[in-house]
Amino acid sequence: YTESISGLEKLRMSKYVQSKIGLSFIHTENFLKKGKIVMFVGTPCQIHGLKLFLRKDYENLITVDFVCHGVPSPKIWKIYLNKTAKTNDIKQISFRNKKLGWENFSFVLQYKKQKSLSETLRKNPYLRGFIHDIYLRPCCYVCKNKSFKSGSDFTLADFWGIKNTYPNLYDKNGISCLTINTIHGMEIFPNMNIQGTQ
């Protein structure tokens, strides 16, 4: 988690791996009980899990999920990484580098001492398997939290099809979509500093 604007940088960008919840729910509850405003962002199942853990609503909690494709098996990621790179030599990983645009994104592995590995979606075996649902977690295939059922205040998504709906807003680096799902979200939204079109 982060309590600073500068800390948000590490949380940005797509991460096509399973996240570790660890003590996140406990930290969230502690912050909420102290009266701090908490924005919890996670997969739909993580939002649902947090709500079950908390067992009550908090006015100072804002929950955000995203349209989730599913989560790949951590074992597959580990195998891929071990075959592709020495993990102690990795500087940064980008699962969705947009140098070629958001419709033809690339997997980029930056090393500390050697040339970076850059492969498009069509060439990278890890991304291909993920996009084609070959190695998602078994629970993802029967997810009960997808389709706006997690109880989140907001849902984020890529605005695929914007070329057809709002062609004048199209951007080769992508456009995001924000959906308000709850009354709490409707109350919060006017106070948010968001650039965009409603």
Residue ranges and their predicted role:
Residues Y1-Q198:
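Iron-sulfur-associated redox domains of electron-transfer enzymes in respiratory
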